[in-house]
Amino acid sequence: MTTFDLAILGAYTKDTIVRPAGVTQVDGGGFNYAALAAKLTGLEILAITRLHPDDRGIAGPLREAGVEVVTLESSCSTHMRLEYPSADPDERILSVTSVVDPFAPSDLDGVEARAVLVTASIRGEAPVALLETVKARGALLAIDVQGFVRIVGPDGGLVYDAAGWDERAAVLSLVDILKTDAVEAEALTGERDIRKAARALASEGPAEIVLTHRDGLLVHAGGRDYEAPFRPDEMRGRSGRGDTCIGSYVSKRLLAPPAEATRWAGAVTTLKLEREGPIRRSAAEVEAYLDRN
């Protein structure tokens, strides 16, 4: 049995991205963005996704990049619409027309990994029992909090429901690395100051907080803050920013301390932001960016 360095679990999403310049269709899903970013470290990466059988073609580009892929069948895939009405990359309106069937602890049967990253999109996709299974095996657990605080509203729009997250204490007590963005962090803590918000979240259990915002990322680890800017030559690929960032951070963190992992994640995310869809750059290009900056 292969032991992977990092297993990334999350639903495939069929994304419609709407900008003032036009509409594009993208194969999305946090697992997709995160896995391709993580593979740039050269580690052994496993991507586990749930989707409708008609969408299994998403596995092709991942396998071509050297990522092992497991596709689990669902009655439907998640269909998401992401609308960016202005030039502000953090101003967006999200809605869904269908939601994938949830994952289960048994989906990890036979999976051996040093670390597991859960990139759920909507509450209910990844149950607490799944996270407990990861921790029971002694693996490092990272999650993106969006998949626990976002719910589908009556009109199909995605909304934050931090107050209604009843399993918050149970989840955060299990997590080693927590990914959030500035909007989610404020919803969870009431703090607009990202450093205060990161410290507040760390006090609830996670050893490390990875917080993205429009200008870069902040990592709070070991009582210290580390930062890296996002400096794309042109902003063309906002969707998947956080997934790319956490995938690159967690994978690099398995090899290096927080400061180095933060710089690496900032570089990978910068290059991803220059193009729509998952990152299609090489590790050499990431290193070249770091040398220049």
Where are these regions (language model features)?
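Alpha-helix C-terminal capping segments
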Residues: A35-E44, S251-L254
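Structural motif
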Residues: A7-L9, A115-L117, A142, K179, ...
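Short beta-strand scaffold segments in enzyme catalytic cores
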Residues: L36, M80-E83, L217-H220
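Conserved phosphate-binding/catalytic region of the ribokinase-like
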Residues: M1-T3, A162-A169, R195-N293
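Conserved N-terminal subdomain of the carbohydrate kinase-like
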Residues: T3-L6, K14-Q25, L40-A120, G124-L140, ...
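Short glycine-enriched, charge-decorated loop/helix-capping segments at active-site entrances
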Residues: A21-V26, G156-Y160, P232-D233
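Short catalytic helix/loop segments, enriched in acidic residues and glycine
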Residues: T24-L36
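Conserved beta-alpha-beta core of the PfkB/ribokinase-like small-molecule kinase fold
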Residues: T119-K196, G216
